[in-house]
Amino acid sequence: MKKVNYFGTGRRKSSVARVILTNGTGKITINTRDFEKYLPLPATRLEMIQPLELTEKREVFDVSVNVNGGGLSAQAGAIRLGIARALIESIPELRAILKKSGLLTRDARCVERKKYGLKKARRAPQFSKR
């Protein structure tokens, strides 16, 4: 079988994930480490492989990920979006399934900036009436 690479990029908060799907056996590596070792929490692991499980392509592709920035949860979200985009590049018919389950939507929520005159983004200094 010919080695074919499919690419996808995902972002979440300040994390950026570059995903490469290759025909293979289902091996997942993140930053050259096994994904079970990189993501210790089962919830983040499940979130990350959601597109592969939904489309039943878990055993069909090897996934290689380069991710940086943010925390582990944000990185898992970025990887999830990257995998979904790479799956569409490989098999365009999967778009409807992934779109319906919301896996192609970029989560635009990010940290609100701190404003001057306030202690945090919205927290005002304590008010004293007298």
Curated annotation (Swiss-Prot):
Lineage, uppermost ranks: Bacteria, Bacillati, Mycoplasmatota, Mollicutes, Acholeplasmatales
Cellular compartments per GO CC: cytosolic small ribosomal subunit
Gene from which the chain derives: rpsI
Keyword annotations from UniProtKB, A to Z: Ribonucleoprotein, Ribosomal protein
UniProt-listed NCBIfam families: PRK00132.1 (NF001099)
Family from the record: Belongs to the universal ribosomal protein uS9 family.
Organism the protein comes from: Aster yellows witches'-broom phytoplasma (strain AYWB)
UniProt GO MF annotations: RNA binding; structural constituent of ribosome
Entry-linked HAMAP family: Ribosomal_uS9_B
Protein name: Small ribosomal subunit protein uS9
Keyword Ribosomal protein annotated: yes
UniProt keyword annotation of Ribonucleoprotein present: yes
PANTHER family, sorted: RIBOSOMAL PROTEIN S9, SMALL RIBOSOMAL SUBUNIT PROTEIN US9M
Gene Ontology process terms (BP): translation
